[in-house]
């Protein structure tokens, strides 16, 4: 009878240990998935920010170009 008790306790102990290891791995996997999703979201936000910055620089370049042309025309044709 004592042998059966020891065997049963051993089986239960090993089952609990393996179950806790599986749950820990599952939690780690979920955390990694959350981190990957956050990284993807950050990447999308960074892309939006970069696009907005490039659009602003493009607009600024157009304005500077027009001003430069206006200044050049003013100095080349001072009669106007």
Curated annotation (Swiss-Prot):
Belongs to the frog skin active peptide (FSAP) family. Dermaseptin subfamily. One of its GO terms (cellular component) is extracellular region. Disulfide bonds: none annotated. It is found in: Secreted. Keywords: Amphibian defense peptide, Antibiotic, Antimicrobial, Cleavage on pair of basic residues, Secreted, Signal. Has antibacterial activity. Residues 1-22 form the signal peptide. One of its GO terms (biological process) is defense response to bacterium. Residues 30-44 have a biased composition (Acidic residues). Residues 23-49 form a propeptide. It holds the Pfam family FSAP_sig_propep. The keyword Magnesium does not apply. This is Raniseptin-8. Expressed by the skin glands. Residues 27-46 are annotated as: Disordered.
